[in-house]
UniProtKB/Swiss-Prot annotation:
One GO BP: malonyl-CoA biosynthetic process
UniProt: Zn(2+) binding residues: C30, C33, C49, C52
Identification of the protein by name: Acetyl-coenzyme A carboxylase carboxyl transferase subunit beta
Pfam families in UniProt: Carboxyl_trans, Zn_ribbon_ACC
Main location: cytoplasm
Domain CoA carboxyltransferase N-terminal: 26-295
Enzyme category, top tier: transferase
Chain positions of all zinc fingers (C4-type): 30-52
Keywords linked to the UniProt accession: ATP-binding, Cytoplasm, Fatty acid biosynthesis, Fatty acid metabolism, Lipid biosynthesis, Lipid metabolism, Metal-binding, Nucleotide-binding, Transferase, Zinc, Zinc-finger
Subcellular location: Cytoplasm
């Protein structure tokens, strides 16, 4: 072996040794700017890239625990889990897909709901888990949503739902399509009772979910750059054979066209929801608004 070969072999072995010393999952990459990020730092930022502000997908349970006051959350309908009633099989058996998704996520299905408080205000909150079969809506997701809405009616408190879904679950056929009617019907009941429902649309919200409860909020909020629509842009382009406008179906485009009410960054979501809900519920704000504090301080300085 020549002296050059020895140098290169030494460098390679030392690099491999260094890589072996780094535990798996310590680093990750932003899906937008592709910056390498420290995993714990990204988690502290609620899965929002600290470099470019891109909102990555966040685990449903993690989202709800970050929203609700500490130690106030009580999970609802935790015992419900899907069954393969139709004995459906595509490339894989549906029951095998369920088992794989449950093993991967540690959850029973694609929706988690909780009862808790937000700045001391009682609320019911639910969130879709896109990692569980694309957040698709089947019988259990529909049942959990309905039971969460019924809980909000019983407690006379607001209901907030974060959507992240590819739509209805095809493996459940008509049973999944029925959930569109069920979820819409319970929201009509909430409206009759005067119970507020806030829908938060996250990336992506598509198909039967966007065509039912996700767009039926008293206030519809979206996260930045979330993909929202019925069919995806690629399907639409192939159907109409035209190039879609830049940013088509993104939350900024929908806000401009009046399809949603506001866009809220994830870091501001707790404060914004509490402020909106206090107004919808006709209750005092649970905190002093920052603008009011600034105005009061300005008035004092002017008087002096």
């Amino acid at each position: 072996m020549s002296w050059i070969d020895r140098i290169f072999n030494k460098d390679t072995s030392s690099t491999s040794s260094r890589k072996a010393n780094v535990p798996e999952g310590v680093w990750t990459k932003c899906t937008s700017c592709e910056q390498v990020l420290y995993r714990d730092e990204l988690r502290r930022h609620l899965e929002v890239c600290p470099k470019c502000g891109h909102h990555m997908r966040i685990d449903a349970r993690e989202r709800l625990l970050a929203l609700l006051d500490k130690d106030s959350s009580q999970e609802l309908s935790a015992e419900l889990e899907p069954k393969d009633i139709l004995k459906f099989k595509d490339l894989k058996k549906y029951k095998d897909r369920i088992s794989a998704a449950q093993k991967e996520t540690g959850e029973k299905d694609a929706l988690i709901s909780m009862f808790g408080t937000l700045y001391g205000m009682p609320i019911v909150a639910a969130a879709s888990n896109f990692s569980f079969m694309g957040g698709s809506m089947g019988s259990v997701v529909g049942a959990k949503f309905v039971q969460a809405a019924e809980k909000a009616i019983a407690e006379n408190c607001p209901f907030v739902c974060f959507s992240a879904s590819g739509g209805a679950r095809m493996q459940e056929a008509l049973f999944s399509l029925m959930q569109m009617a069920k979820t819409s019907a319970v929201l009509a009941k909430m409206r009759e009772q005067g119970v507020p429902f806030i829908s938060v649309l996250t990336d992506p919200t598509l198909g039967g979910v966007s065509a039912s409860f996700a767009m039926l909020g008293d206030i519809n909020i979206a996260e930045p750059k979330a993909l929202i629509g019925f069919a995806g842009p690629r399907v639409i382009e192939q159907t109409v054979r035209e190039k879609l406008p830049e940013g088509f179906q993104r939350s900024e485009f929908l806000l401009e066209k009046g399809a949603i009410d506001m866009i809220v960054k994830r870091a501001d979501m707790r404060h914004t929801l509490a402020s909106v809900l206090s107004k919808l519920s006709n209750k005092p704000s649970p905190f002093v608004e920052p603008e009011l504090v600034e105005n009061e301080e300005q008035s004092k300085s002017d008087n002096e």
